[in-house]
C-alpha cells in the first residue's frame, strides 16, 4: 500500500451546535448518512452534549477525508456519501456509498480514520491508501547555461 493522501480537520463544537440550532436539526440530516443519523439521534436522546460531539466528529471526519482524497467537498465526495461508523471495539472506520464508492474503487483507495473530541473541539485525521502503483515520475530536466 502507498499513501494516496492525508487529511486533518479541527472543528469548534459550539459552532456545530449553533448551526444545528439555527437549522432546526436539518444540518444533521444534510451531513450525516443514514447509519450515522441513527447513532446521532440515539446519543442525543441520552445526552445533548454527546449527540452534538458525535455530529462534530463526523463532520470533521468528512472534511478530513475530502482533503485526504484531494477533492475537497466536490463530486463525487458528498456529505452523505461517506459515513464514519465504529467497530464493536470503538475503532472508527469509513464506509463510502454510491458514486464515491465507485470512484474510490477505481483508484484502489481505502482509508483509515481517527476522531476525537474534548469539550470545545473535535478533530479527525485520515490516511488514504492505494494499492494502485503511481505513474512513473517524469525524468528530471537538465538545464545548462551557455
Swiss-Prot record:
Mg(2+) binds at residues 9, 63. Signal peptide: none annotated. It is found in: Cytoplasm. Its cofactor is Mg(2+). Disulfide bonds: none annotated. Belongs to the P-Pant transferase superfamily. AcpS family. This is Holo-[acyl-carrier-protein] synthase. The lineage of its organism: Bacteria, Pseudomonadati, Pseudomonadota, Betaproteobacteria, Burkholderiales.
Amino acid at each position: 500500500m502507498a499513501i494516496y493522501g492525508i487529511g486533518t480537520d479541527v472543528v469548534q463544537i459550539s459552532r456545530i451546535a449553533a448551526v444545528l440550532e439555527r437549522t432546526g436539526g436539518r444540518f444533521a440530516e444534510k451531513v450525516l448518512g443514514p447509519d450515522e443519523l441513527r447513532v446521532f439521534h440515539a446519543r442525543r436522546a441520552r445526552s445533548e452534549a454527546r449527540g452534538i460531539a458525535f455530529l462534530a466528529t463526523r463532520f470533521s471526519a468528512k472534511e478530513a477525508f475530502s482533503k485526504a482524497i484531494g477533492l475537497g467537498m466536490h463530486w463525487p465526495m458528498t456529505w452523505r456519501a461517506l459515513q464514519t461508523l465504529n467497530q464493536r471495539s470503538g475503532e472508527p472506520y469509513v464506509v463510502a456509498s454510491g458514486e464515491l464508492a465507485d470512484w474510490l474503487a477505481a483508484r484502489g483507495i481505502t482509508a483509515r480514520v481517527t476522531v476525537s473530541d474534548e469539550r470545545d473541539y473535535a478533530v479527525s485525521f485520515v490516511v488514504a491508501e492505494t494499492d494502485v502503483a503511481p505513474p512513473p515520475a517524469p525524468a528530471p530536466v537538465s538545464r545548462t547555461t551557455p
